[in-house]
């Protein structure tokens, strides 16, 4: 009986514990220098823990309506909506069955092109946003004005910072370019490529590019990226 009480008490104590450092970031940098480590060592370790402690967000079923299955990602701050055509799946033509919502319109993802051509960047918009939607970084309270005066968010990985910039600024704008330069030296966190492909349903679109997962998006690509949010 005593053992059970101690277990409950310890569980409540851990549940109330806040995630995050109790010292400001500059203090952690000073600590890093004192033990001959890189100044971003704490941010790197902490971000990795935040990203993979809960294995990120997942794709969840919402409803079935008029021949489509509707799904959405579980993250509240970056919610992506996707659907798949049940008629195409019945015809075993699952390659073009998935669509994602971009600025109120449905766009097809996972198209297989039969004629030769340069299709390398055709799906960049989806995989850019999909990477951020899956990441478990807490994207609440991100203020673009505070970011402009140098208040960097230590608890966001580089991909999520780039995503917030794309979401809150216009493509090819001077404002976006300036903010991307601020985030240029932020530490990039690798996300395993299987996270892009492994979802709760079979026959999901195949991620063909490691960009955003094992290789960071370039400044040029982020500058030109169209946001899916209205």
From Swiss-Prot:
GO cellular component terms, semicolon-separated: host cell cytoplasm; virion component
Keyword Protein biosynthesis: no
Name of the protein: Virion infectivity factor
Primary location class: host cell
Recorded family membership: Belongs to the ovine/caprine lentivirus group Vif protein family.
Keywords on record: Host cytoplasm, Virion
Pfam entry (one): Lenti_VIF_2
InterPro entries hit by this protein: Lenti_VIF_2
Compartmental location: Host cytoplasm; Virion
Organism name: Maedi visna virus (strain 1514 / clone LV1-1KS1)
Keyword Metal-binding set for record: no
Gene: vif
